[in-house]
Every structure is written in structure tokens, then in C-alpha cells.
């Protein structure tokens, strides 16, 4: 099974993947985030945040309040399963999480929590056999 994925978020506020599948056979899963754009992180920064679908809006709202210094993620937010730091153009970051944190049949969302980005920059993550 492929236990990692590469995803890019660009200056046009788009992720290059709308869906990520994670195999149950993976113990851990790694997301490699790349920003192929040119704009700095304070202007057009992107991160990759994973929550349950139902938790996305709350995590986005609290993340905005947390600010750039906290990567637009509320400190110790139990709703956030995994997240990268906020990166700017030309930068990369990775995050690895335990697949045991995912439940079969649950709907998971990934998104960028930079203010105003999540409406366009989001996708679905699924646990598969």
C-alpha cells in the first residue's frame, strides 16, 4: 500500500488533489505538502489540516483566531487529527499521523486553514481496505 501522498497548494488557492485515500494496512500515513507558487506565507500561505467533516468549520474558525504564529490551528485542538505548518511559495512541509486515529465509515475533510482559503482549498480523505 502507498502510505504517503504528495499534495500541492498554489498561488491560485487550489490543492491539486480533491481526494486522498489511506489504506487500513498503513500503520502511519505521511502527507507531503508543497507550495509551487511565488507568494510569501503571510500573503498566500497554505497548510494541510485534517479533521472529521463535521469538525471542519469549527476548526477553521478557531484556527483563524489562533493566527499565523500558530499556523492558523488552535493550540492542542482535539478536533485536528494532523496538520502541517503554514508554508509560502517554494516551501515544503510534511506531517505523519497514526492511521489508527481514523475510523472506517467516518467522513474526513482536509483543508487549508489560512483565512479565506478553506472554501476553495479542501478535499475528502477516506480510509480504505
UniProtKB/Swiss-Prot annotation:
Mostly located where? Answer: periplasm
- Disulfide-bond pairs as recorded: 3-26
Question: What domain of life?
Answer: Bacteria
Q: CDD domains from the xrefs?
A: Azurin
Q: Which UniProt keywords apply?
A: Copper, Disulfide bond, Electron transport, Metal-binding, Periplasm, Transport
**Residues engaged in binding Cu cation:** 46, 112, 117, 121
Cellular component GO terms, alphabetically?
periplasmic space
Subcellular localization: Periplasm
Q: Per the database record, which ranges form the Plastocyanin-like domain? A: 1-129
- Record GO terms (molecular function): copper ion binding; electron transfer activity
Task performed by this protein? Transfers electrons from cytochrome c551 to cytochrome oxidase.
Which PANTHER family does the entry link to?
Answer: AURACYANIN-B, OUTER MEMBRANE PROTEIN H.8
Q: Would you tell me the protein name for this molecule?
A: Azurin-1
Amino acid at each position: 500500500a502507498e502510505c504517503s501522498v504528495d499534495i500541492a497548494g498554489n498561488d491560485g488557492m487550489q490543492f491539486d488533489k480533491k481526494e486522498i485515500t489511506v489504506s487500513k494496512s498503513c500503520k502511519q500515513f505521511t502527507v507531503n505538502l508543497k507550495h509551487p507558487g511565488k507568494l510569501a506565507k503571510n500573503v498566500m500561505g497554505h497548510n494541510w489540516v485534517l479533521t472529521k467533516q463535521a469538525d471542519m468549520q469549527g476548526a477553521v474558525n478557531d484556527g483563524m483566531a489562533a493566527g499565523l504564529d500558530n499556523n492558523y490551528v488552535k493550540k492542542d485542538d482535539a478536533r485536528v487529527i494532523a496538520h502541517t505548518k503554514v508554508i509560502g511559495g517554494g516551501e515544503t512541509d510534511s506531517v505523519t499521523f497514526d492511521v489508527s486515529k481514523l475510523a472506517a465509515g467516518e467522513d474526513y475533510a482536509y483543508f487549508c486553514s489560512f483565512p479565506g482559503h478553506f472554501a476553495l482549498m479542501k478535499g475528502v480523505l477516506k480510509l480504505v481496505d
